[in-house]
Amino acid sequence: MANSSPVYDWFQERLEIQDIADDVTSKYVPPHVNIFYCLGGITLVCFLIQFATGFAMTFYYKPTVTEAYNSVSYLMTDVSFGWLIRSVHRWSASMMVLMLILHVFRVYLTGGFKRPRELTWVTGVVMAVITVAFGVTGYSLPWDQVGYWAVKIVSGVPAAIPVVGDFMVELLRGGESVGQTTLTRFYSLHTFVLPWTLAIFMLMHFLMIRKQGISGPL
């Protein structure tokens, strides 16, 4: 690069950052690609917003059955811009689900799931399931009447599964009934297990797209 700085030269000599930049910026984009091919990227942006706003809320949220509701109320009424942070979190959650659904339809209608992109489709389906799990676990965290009964109903659904149903219910609830252990498990899932699992599958998803390229037109 002409007129490069000493700092740039130092990194270029060791990491060859220009080659990386050229690879990222010079990828061929097929002429049939339109705005509907951006739905996956918009879903990623929504996830990043979720991550940032969710991280901000962890400074104030208290995952106990006695303090969860009051901590959310405090965030909404007393914390500067707390209402905005939580509202953006909720809006981006809805937007993420909507963009995910539209993205799945686009991929299906354009045949993006066909050979050799079957694994890309599989990772996408897994991420869709994780996104739904995000909604279920996040819905319970305010621990109000809606959240409590939602958890009770959802965690009781596996009881209909033969043999392992009762075990799965107890695993989700942390006991025979819904209580503090249930809230703790849902909080851990929502703030740690699910985000990192989704991030791993996103990385796999993007690497496969990067390797195989965008599918052709029908």
Curated annotation (Swiss-Prot):
UniProt miscellaneous comment: Heme 1 (or BH or b566) is high-potential and absorbs at about 566 nm, and heme 2 (or BL or b562) is low-potential and absorbs at about 562 nm.
Keywords from the UniProt entry: Electron transport, Heme, Iron, Membrane, Metal-binding, Photosynthesis, Thylakoid, Transmembrane, Transmembrane helix, Transport
InterPro entries in UniProt: Cyt_b/b6_N (IPR005797), Cyt_B6_PetB (IPR023530), Cytb/b6-like_sf (IPR027387), Cytochrome_b_N_euk/bac (IPR048259), Di-haem_cyt_TM (IPR016174)
Cofactor binding mode and count: Binds 2 heme b groups non-covalently with two histidine residues as axial ligands. Binds one heme group covalently by a single cysteine link with no axial amino acid ligand. This heme was named heme ci.
GO BP: photosynthesis; respiratory electron transport chain
Entry GO CC: plasma membrane-derived thylakoid membrane
Subcellular location: Cellular thylakoid membrane
Functional note: Component of the cytochrome b6-f complex, which mediates electron transfer between photosystem II (PSII) and photosystem I (PSI), cyclic electron flow around PSI, and state transitions.
Upper lineage: Bacteria, Bacillati, Cyanobacteriota, Cyanophyceae, Synechococcales
Subunit relationships: The 4 large subunits of the cytochrome b6-f complex are cytochrome b6, subunit IV (17 kDa polypeptide, PetD), cytochrome f and the Rieske protein, while the 4 small subunits are PetG, PetL, PetM and PetN. The complex functions as a dimer.
Example GO molecular function: metal ion binding
Binding site for heme b 2: 89, 190
Membrane topology according to the record: Multi-pass membrane protein
Pfam families: Cytochrome_B
Taxonomic superkingdom: Bacteria
Binding annotation for heme c: 38
Membrane-spanning segments: 35-55, 93-113, 119-139, 189-209
Protein name per the record: Cytochrome b6
Binding-site residues for heme b 1, renumbered to this chain: 103, 205
Stated family: Belongs to the cytochrome b family. PetB subfamily.
Cofactor list: heme b; heme c
